[in-house]
């Protein structure tokens, strides 16, 4: 291609680019490049086209190629710059600065405007890459260029300002050249500003100063800039603040700097730098309080001023506030660490560390000393600075490391012998070791070298103070140096504290001492010792206002858990002032500070006690005693509070603890006596008179001990008198009190006092109390004591002259009490009571006294009641009623007024009498109320005609009257033991409660009281009652003797005598007595009863016909009794004459009207049905009765019993019936538990498999409730046997195999102990023997079983059942050997069974023997025989067991593959009959197994087996067997889906046998 063609192609390329045909352009360029590879324009055009086609890499390569070819040509560089600007190319950041630089070079001489534009772009690029120096230099060059071009000042100002903006943002990273260019830029920008002053100019100036302040070495320039701005803007704070802060931080705060600070504070009173500057000036002037105040306020505004924090710490150290100083130093150090490590900051850091260490050492505690050592270790070159070494030694001394401290001290002494601090250090170490003489010398040497150090004077004064009494009192010693220290350092609080000690303890000048303590506390408000001393002295000087002011100031400032001393003292102040709530709050605050201060706890207890908080006070004193076990006071207060709260036993225990420590502590002895006295009073209220006597004896013992130590204390004599008088109500026979001879005027020993002697001693004690202190209440107590003595004389019938004298004395004493205190209603009341006593009878005086008592105390139920009694005594019933009513309205719970109303009701014959007496017993126990209520209960019970009335139902039954009356009457006779009717009523009530022995005892007590009485009839009645009760308790001989002691003329006596003879077994004599009774009987009913009793007596003698004749005589009377008809019915049952029994029962049903007879009627009816063999009717009859009377537990119990005996198939219902009986009535429930257990056993395996083992648990419970019942022990034996059988089925070890013999012994022992019917005993013993032998056989204890049978046969050889048992035992080993039995043996066994031919189990056992010998037909015949017997007897369980055994026998034959249609049909027949009897899981299983044997793979086989496996209600063992066969069936059918279902079912039920089979079958 020619050059012309090249030009044409380039032109075409240029045109294509203009027309945006970039691909065409590329083609033309490539055409050119084929001819001329180094054509500049072609490469440039390629770059342009490629850039437009968004092919930056190709464009870059083209431009670079062009630039290489022609480096001084602009086009390629411009294109490259545009390309980099357009695309963020990978090499753009690296290459673009070079491109811009090349363009600058090319534009410099060609186009200044474009040069400037490129220059700005280059600066922006450098700025982005944080190349500050390049930015500064390039922009500087731009400004210079513009200056050369003659640019305006405004433009130049903006350019300089722009440069400040570029560089001001990151001054920390700049080098010196950049910084200088920045400052030059600021200066030029400020100089070129056209508006001065202006807002814009001010901001620029601020930025300039801000930048300068970041560079410490530019301090001169900073100062100049600040001063320049101050001159232009005199009202602006900023330059002043920066300048002040700069001067403060640099440590060059000159007078001029002070002026700046003052000027700044004038402008803004809260200016941080200004206040800090003023604070530093105050510190220099030793105005420490001003310094701390200004520095603290300044640092709030300027918290990052290191020097400010340092100087604040310095001022705080000077003012002896080391804790605050440590915090200030720590703050300064934190700021220094944030600023980084420069030369100045390192210096500041060392200063702060030094000061912090000094402050920490002043704190003196171990942790602070440890921290001080760590702080000193941080100071550079600390080991070479003596001052720091001194501090380290002091730190070691404070923490107890004396060896380290001494070592440093010795090194310092050798290196710096002229340094005062070193000698002072040596002195302190000697002082610590209590070597005060050496310490004195060293401090003196230190003071010789520096006399103006307050600390040295203080320490020397302290040395003298502790050196001894002499130096302490010597004014030239301790006092002089303390005063010098106080003069040199007026902020040293501790020196003022010791000056206070000096003036208080040595001089005795309390006012001056208080001034010193106040000064010390003002200087250091954490000095608890000074504060406490100031407060204590103020209290001593009776300046409570000042004391309270100090305490309030401290407590207001105190944080939680501090200032204990102040809280404690203020709490005690409030406690003394009676402000209890404030005292509690303050003492609680004191305890927060020190929870282990027992004094605080005691004070808090006192505060709680003062405001009536006994429980909280008790806790406080308890805590105090725990913290200080030696404190008697705390324990005493605990005891005293427990005594107040009525916890007398606990109080006694606490008092005893005190007495053990200090035997003569009278308050504790008094407390012990009071507690026993109060317990005696409580016992008397509960009518526990014996306890009360014991408590009084103890109380007198303690009061006597107290009087031995303090016989001059009146209250102790009064308390002893109270104790003696307290037992006035107790029966004289019970009062035998042992009193220490000291109280009776003897030197030693004890004396037993009777009631009259004790009361007399009480009067003497009151007399001694009056001699010591004559008080109205003691006169009153003495008067009451004389009254009680008079009462006792009247009760015992003693000398009437003495009685009169005592009553006169009583009146005299009570009048004296009234004269001393005429407003006390109790004294008037007591005087009234004595005045109306029968020995005086001054009713007018009594009425006057009661009225005066009411006038003295309006709410006075006692006086109104006494007034009512007075009116009632004088037969003024209406007035008495009104008085009692008034008393009731005033105090409805006051017992006596209710008794009064009851007596009025009784007098007028009101129906409310019984209710009122009952209400008195509900309120509290009182002899009059108790006797009245018991009388009305007995009276109501004796009236047999009222049983169906609502009044009887409510008063007796609903109100539970009999036990309530019995309880209160027991209390009555406990106290009043000479009133025979009370014992008679008590015996009567005990009879009703079936407490026969207690009733007999009560009747016997009545007899003893009536022996000397003239009323012989009453005595005979008591004997009759006693004899009747002896007979019912089984003491027949005593009963016979009792009745013989009566004339035996009254019908009741003769009948009682006859009954006693009958119960003793003297039937002939009993018959004679009944015949004698017949001769004198009058009423038809009584005659019927006697004839019935006579008939029973004749029956007992074997005269059945005579008995029947007598009972027939009863039945033909006009009014035959139900008892005689019941006896006739029972006689028919005994004779097995159903016709007679039925006729008697029909007659009986005509006369029975009461619901109470339901049980007897039902029992007799069901017994007749049982005699007739109608088992179903037996259950139906009782079920019908239960439905009619669902609340009768006896019927439920009977139902449970007959179900177990006659209807075992309904055993589940029998269990329910037994449980209901047990719930309704625990008495019937005892026997019902046995029936329940028997029914549970009858339910079979479904019950036995229960995890709770229901039957066994039930029978165990029954054994606990009735251990004397032999049937229960027999039942327990059966339950254990069932449990062992279940264990064998489940392949587990039986648990109770050793119990059979023990339980058999328990049955025999129970039969001997209790009297049961003979045939019942024999049956139970035989059954128990059979069960025990069976259990022994099953558990393999053959020899024991054989021994048991042999032993039983020796005592009675004629026992076919036992012989059968023996044969079963003997055959067991033979059968287990699986050898054929000889014919002779089989014949012997057959004979034995034939001798027990009516026994179903015997035939079943013989069948089992035949089966073991392969004699299947013979076995079948035996089973059929057992089935026949069971059917004849109606034994459901016998029939079921026989059918199942028969079916099992036939199935075994079938399984043996014996081809005979007889056996399969026998299985089907027997199981079908069993299923007719009841749902029988075993029968269903046997049918399924028969089907399995017949057709293993048939669908019917699976259906039958699945029914057993999956349907509920099948026992585990049966379901497991079915599961085993079903698994075999399914594997035979290869039905793996159903196999998986069955395996999951086996896993759910824990059937390991089935799972093992599955593993075996699946592996084959």
UniProtKB/Swiss-Prot annotation:
Cite a single GO BP annotation.
Answer: nuclear-transcribed mRNA catabolic process, 3'-5' exonucleolytic nonsense-mediated decay
Expression by tissue, per the entry, reads: Widely expressed with the highest levels observed in vascular tissues, lymph node, pituitary, lung and intestine. Not expressed in the liver.
- Where the TPR repeats fall, as residue ranges, is 6-39, 40-73, 272-305, 307-339, 386-419, 420-453, 455-492, 493-527, 564-597, 598-631, 633-665, 679-713, 790-824, 826-860, 861-894, 980-1013, 1020-1054, 1056-1084, 1326-1359, 1400-1433
Consequence of changing residue 1485 to R: Found in a THES1 patient
Query: Where does this protein have coiled-coil stretches?
Result: none
- InterPro entries reported for this sequence: Ski3/TTC37, TPR-like_helical_dom_sf, TPR_rpt
Q: Which Pfam families match?
A: TPR_16, TPR_19, TPR_8
The function of this protein is: Component of the SKI complex, a multiprotein complex that assists the RNA-degrading exosome during the mRNA decay and quality-control pathways. The SKI complex catalyzes mRNA extraction from 80S ribosomal complexes in the 3'-5' direction and channels mRNA to the cytosolic exosome for degradation. SKI-mediated extraction of mRNA from stalled ribosomes allow binding of the Pelota-HBS1L complex and subsequent ribosome disassembly by ABCE1 for ribosome recycling. In the nucleus, the SKI complex associates with transcriptionally active genes in a manner dependent on PAF1 complex (PAF1C).
The identity of this protein, by name, is Superkiller complex protein 3
Organism listed in the record: Homo sapiens
